[in-house]
Regions:
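Serine-hydrolase catalytic core recognition
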Residues: 1-178
Length: 178
């Protein structure tokens, strides 16, 4: 699918239950880790795969590399500079809408998201800023305020010294939106 700019290809994977019935509607669970130091869509076989495990519970699970992740181009990656809260959400949502337009079993009225560490931060941000799309989130060990997390990691993506962009990207500052 194309991303927010309507031309950049966004890559992702879809996991369906092994007893998938194309006539049924399935909730969607996004497995997210939008840390800018890597990409999340697996490029290799994994013996143990949490996305596969959740799909077996009766959901369609997706993993998407939105803008802000690396290994594509500098412009693609720079979306996250001082903007970790973006997490590629406009691209992720466009990708899932494209999936639903091609697959009638995808129920976009039931989209949940989960992640750990930076993925936990992303999962919480999904329901803070995109609650019209994501109806539930599970955030494991999220670094919800980059002013209180390991600075060596954060200053790579947020810069130094700490400035107003840290507050703009803080889930804690926006917790009242829940």
């Amino acid at each position: 699918a194309n991303g927010r700019d309507a031309k950049t290809k966004i890559w992702g994977l879809v996991y369906r239950p092994s007893n998938f019935d194309p006539t049924m509607k399935y909730p969607v669970i996004e497995n997210i880790y939008a840390g800018p130091h890597g990409q999340h869509v697996p490029k290799w076989f994994e013996l143990r795969n949490r996305s596969r495990e959740y799909a077996e519970l009766g959901a369609i699970v997706v993993q998407i590399d939105g803008m802000g992740t690396n290994w594509r181009s500098k412009a693609f990656h720079d979306v996250c500079w001082k903007n970790l809260k973006d997490a590629g959400f406009p691209d992720r949502i466009a990708w899932m809408r494209e999936l639903a337009s091609r697959d009638s079993s995808v129920d976009l009225s039931r989209v949940a998201i989960f992640g750990g560490s930076a993925g936990g931060q992303n999962a919480m941000r999904a329901v803070l800023d995109y609650s019209d799309f994501y109806c539930a989130a599970a955030a494991d060990c999220g670094c919800h305020d980059n002013r209180m997390d390991k600075i060596w990691w954060n200053e790579q993506w947020m810069g130094w010294p700490v400035d107003e962009s840290y507050a703009r990207n803080s889930n804690m500052e926006d917790a009242g939106k829940l």
